[in-house]
Regions:
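Phosphate-coordinating loops and pocket residues in cytosolic domains that bind phosphorylated ligands
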Residues: 45, 203, 212-213
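Short, hydrophobic secondary-structure boundary micro-motifs
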Residues: 79-84, 106-108, 161-165, 190, ...
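Acidic/histidine-enriched, glycine/proline-rich intrinsically disordered or flexible terminal extensions
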Residues: 132, 214-222
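Residue-level recognition of oxygen-bearing side chains
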Residues: 67, 193, 206
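Short, solvent-exposed turn/loop segments enriched in Gly/Ser/Thr/Pro and often Arg
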Residues: 32, 169, 214
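GST-like domain detector, emphasizing the conserved glutathione-binding G-site
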Residues: 1-131, 135
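GST-like fold's C-terminal all-alpha helical module
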Residues: 100-203
Length: 222
């Protein structure tokens, strides 16, 4: 049976959702974040980097969200959740699957980290740290996030999903960046196509089952 090492309020929710869409049996080991919001050190007993999601299947360890999504669809998908190779939909699928972690998440992580920097320095240095953090956010991070959100809205306006009219692994991969952006980026909740995309995926029975089986996931409330 597949085992999922699930860090609460993390990208691991996507893996549970995918497993539910595929109708696979699995068990979940939930890890709670520490007071510093980091993963517990016990995750390093599973994988050297101590990150989540990580799955175990057939005695092997698989890490990285995109790699796990590809592995599960390749191994158990039976043609589901992935367009036919050689089609335009397949090219879009590959693009968005890699874009989720390669382009979207680095910006969102930087947004989060720079918002926390002032709280991590000595009190007397906080005014300077705040100025630097806000400067980086306003000059670099926020403009790029604005462009990316506009890109999502444009693509989703075509047919409601990222790769066409049917749900794919790329839509599952993109769910976390979009949900995280709802709580970190101003104006995202006013984008109608993005809002419809979230309403659509959250209404899926598999998504709801994943919420019940996993740990805390605050992003489902955005």
């Amino acid at each position: 049976m597949i085992s999922v090492h699930y860090l609460d309020n993390s990208r691991a929710h996507r893996i549970l959702w995918l497993l539910e869409e595929l109708g696979l049996e699995y068990d979940v080991k939930v890890y709670a974040r520490g007071s510093d919001m980091r993963a517990p050190k016990t995750l390093k007993d599973v994988h050297p980097l101590g990150k989540s999601p990580v799955i175990e299947d057939g005695g092997k360890i698989y890490a990285e969200s995109g790699a796990i999504i590809e592995y599960l669809i390749d191994t158990y998908g039976k043609g589901a959740l992935r367009p036919k190779q050689g089609t335009d939909a397949y090219r879009r699928y590959v693009y968005w699957l890699h874009y989720a972690e390669g382009s979207a998440m680095p910006l969102l992580v930087m947004k989060l980290l720079f918002s926390r920097i002032p709280r991590q320095v000595p009190f007397l240095l906080r005014p300077v740290a705040t100025l630097i953090s806000k400067g980086v956010a306003s000059k670099f991070i926020n403009p790029q996030l604005k462009d990316n959100v506009a890109f999502w809205e444009s693509e989703l306006s075509k047919d409601g999903l990222f790769t066409g009219g049917e749900l794919t692994g790329a839509d599952i991969a993109m769910s976390f960046p979009v949900e995280a952006a709802m709580s970190r980026v101003d104006g995202v909740d006013a984008q109608p196509a993005i809002r419809l995309y979230l309403d659509t995926i959250r209404a899926r029975p598999a998504y709801q089952r994943a919420l019940k089986k996993g740990g805390a996931y605050v992003y489902a409330k955005s």
